[in-house]
Amino acid sequence: MWCNPIICALDTYDINHALRLTKMLYGKISMVKLGLEFFTAHGLSGVQAVSDCGIPIFLDLKLHDIPNTVGKAISVIKSLNIAMLTIHISGGRDMMLSAIDSIFGSMIKLIGVTVLTSIDDSDLKDIGIDRSSIQHVMLLSKVAQEIGLYGIVCSAFEVQEVRNQCGKDFKLVVPGIRFEDDYSDQKRVKNPKDAILAGADYLVIGRPITMSSDPIQTVDAILSSINL
């Protein structure tokens, strides 16, 4: 980890809000996450503006396309100061290998997306996947590690089993971190302490921080709850 496990998810198209929060949280968190909403609105220049604030960037684009397209997209993205970038493991081995080839010469770490935290077993069944969410995550995690990705994104419910399967050096990024009274649109979620105890390396936390009246106090409370 860079300094602590918290990645603040700036899920917004408002660049001024994103910059304000990034500057406020400098030195308090490990990274900020910029996703599709922000990237669609502001592109490479917007990512660069946030990066200029000095906090490492977790660019969560969940790339999923043919190998050549993903490779070329990453060749453009790697001009930015990005710490981690997400790609879908379900894009296949050739796509992931193309992504790995394309980050050569940069500091970018590739993180594989397994099963979104908004999806549960019934959703998987609807799209023709007969495995449970944890079985599917375990399968995809194994493939990602064999290919050579830096780590994966999974829910806190799968962390312990993935850790046992993949070992201590494979990084586990856990989104869907909520407090007990706020599960919103996420289905497979846990609170910060439970996620860390289960074996998470990074916690992606959005609204509990970004919608707080005092984001710094909220971050301090989260760190205190996990004894950091």
From Swiss-Prot:
Domain of life: Bacteria
InterPro entries recorded: Aldolase_TIM, OMPdecase, OMPdecase_AS, OMPdecase_bac, OMPdeCOase_dom, RibuloseP-bd_barrel
Binding site for substrate: 11, 33, 60-69, 117, 178, 186, 206-207
EC number(s) reported in the record: 4.1.1.23
Description of how the protein assembles with itself and partners: Homodimer.
Purpose: Catalyzes the decarboxylation of orotidine 5'-monophosphate (OMP) to uridine 5'-monophosphate (UMP).
Protein name: Orotidine 5'-phosphate decarboxylase
Organism the protein comes from: Ehrlichia canis (strain Jake)
Lineage, opening ranks: Bacteria, Pseudomonadati, Pseudomonadota, Alphaproteobacteria, Rickettsiales
